Amino acid sequence: LRLIYFKILLVIVGFVVGSVVLAQELLPSPPPDHSLIYVLDQQNKLTALPFEQAHSPIHPNDVAKSTKSSYLELKGEHAAAVLAPTQRIFVFVTDRGGAHTPMIVWLTPHHGARRVTVTTQRGLAGFAISSDQIVKPAVRGLTKNGDEVFMELRPRVSLMPGEYAIIGGDLSRVATFRVSVASAQ
């Protein structure tokens, strides 16, 4: 009887230890190039996402004369990088007042290009991305060095197949990727 209880206890301990090991995630060390946006690949290595330049009729560095809706556009129908719906994204951000975390946004197709809707507000410089196109992230700070934080941006839910961008303040450096039906399975 003691042998049976011992075996049952051993099985329970095995399940508990196994589930704890599975629950732990690999947290990568910060890479040397802090200017790039990274994803964790299948081999648990950080790989940089390619950048594209966004074009827009608005001038985000100028103070807006009126409040209006417009767009940011990326040339081409598809991004070069294809990610899985739950791919982990890592970025360096500045931890200062007025600095914003780059946002994951859903892009819509438009005549061979990809777009996101933006709004400018009278009297302010910059732009706001339409809230229905922002992917709400779970943000986790991993390491901090001075006023720079290495963090993980993870969508709260799996991404649907489509085109996405990670947009910060510099429209010449927009990281893009797509989630295809094949990568979603």
Features from the language model and the residues they span:
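Bacterial N-terminal signal peptides
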Residues: 7-19
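Extended, solvent-exposed segments with strong compositional bias
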Residues: 121-148
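Surface-exposed coil/turn segments at beta-strand junctions on protein surfaces, enriched
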Residues: 84, 144-146, 159
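Positively charged n-region of N-terminal signal peptides that target proteins for export
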Residues: 1-6
